[in-house]
Amino acid sequence: MKYESIRPQVEQIAREAGRIILSFGEFHVEEKEGHANFVTDVDCAVQEYLAKVLSDLLPGSHFIGEEQENEQLTCAPTWVIDPVDGTTNLIHNYRQSAVSIALLEDKHPVLAAVYQPYTDELFFAMKGCGATLNGQKISASSHPFERALTCFGTSPYNAELAERSMRLALAFLQNAADIRRSGSAALDLANVACGRIDVFFEIVLKPWDFAAGALLVTEAGGRFMMPFEDGEIRFDCPRGILAANGKCAEQALALIRSI
């Protein structure tokens, strides 16, 4: 595959970014626009590191990160990253945060790495090559919808969507097996990919939250959809997303669209 040669370096970079996260004993917290929307100097340090090493790894590539939103996605090779997905978890030492790295070409993911530094779990995928966890092949689950464990995401700074998110969560609680909320979409998508959970949805997510996870899910045999719109899956602006195993996907999609 085209980017197979850089896989070892990307994996090493993801792990080093995780080590940076773990190296901070204390850190400074600032609020961004919106209620309870935080950024720390950990986010900034990891993004600065990733911007440099990924650009050096693939000269001429572009870079879009959560803490630097000003670049527009083009067809050129572009790194789309979230330096710390789960910043609020990090602040509270909840230990559910991840480094999310995706390489997009022609505006779609071709390489993905999600690293959970607290458990030393590295999820990796390349288009057409399957998905792995610490080098071992992974696949989405085969649980039917009535046995599905569902994760969902929402955020205090999208308060206008909170009520609908909770209605959807209640519907899944009443129709599937159970629900969870982890606070890290990248990890939730990775957990769909490896079969730990069966469904994940969120009404609005930024591309750096889901670009890597989308490729992990599809390469693991799951389904990745945008349930609130028709047409091509896009990674150039905020979207609502649904990820599920093949057995759950259609029922989950129908339930979301019915609420």
Please provide the spans of the model-predicted regions.
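Residue-level signal for inorganic ion chemistry
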Residues: 21, 43, 54, 87, ...
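Generic detector of well-ordered alpha-helical packing
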Residues: 44, 67, 83-86, 117, ...
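N-terminal subdomain of lithium-sensitive/metallo-dependent phosphomonoesterases centered on the IMPase/IPPase/PAP
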Residues: 1-84, 254-257
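An extended, acidic
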Residues: 140-259
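Short, isolated positions in well-ordered beta-strands
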Residues: 110, 138-140
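DPxDG-like acidic metal-binding loop motif
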Residues: 73-132
